[in-house]
Design a protein with these regions (language model features):
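Conserved beta-strand core positions
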Residues: 4, 33, 59-61
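C-terminal structural segments of small proteins and small subunits
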Residues: 56-89
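Short amphipathic
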Residues: 1-10
Length: 89
């Protein structure tokens, strides 16, 4: 199962709009996608789960994917995070 740590770099962290974008991207893939922070692991396709991580700017999350398109799912989520969820800040 591919996985990688990613730092949340956008100004507002995983707020509602960023969480919605992340769940939309995760939902495009057949694979299961999870985000973990500290001891909490959530389904990246669940907006409530993603928001419950309370991941602010500078927080590191572990992104994991398992399934037929796991590598592509992981790459897409990591790219979204690196692009600051399209927010520019």
């Amino acid at each position: 199962m591919p996985s990688k740590d990613a730092a949340i770099v956008n100004k507002l962290g995983l707020h509602a709009r960023a969480s919605a974008k992340l769940t939309q991207v995760a939902g495009r893939f057949q694979s299961n996608v999870w985000l973990s922070r500290n001891d909490r692991r959530v389904n990246a396709k669940s907006i409530m789960g993603v928001m419950m991580l309370a991941a602010g700017k500078g927080t590191t999350v572990l992104v994991e994917a398992e399934g037929p398109d796991a590598e592509a799912a992981l790459a897409a989520i990591l790219q979204l995070i690196a692009d600051k969820f399209g927010e520019g800040e």
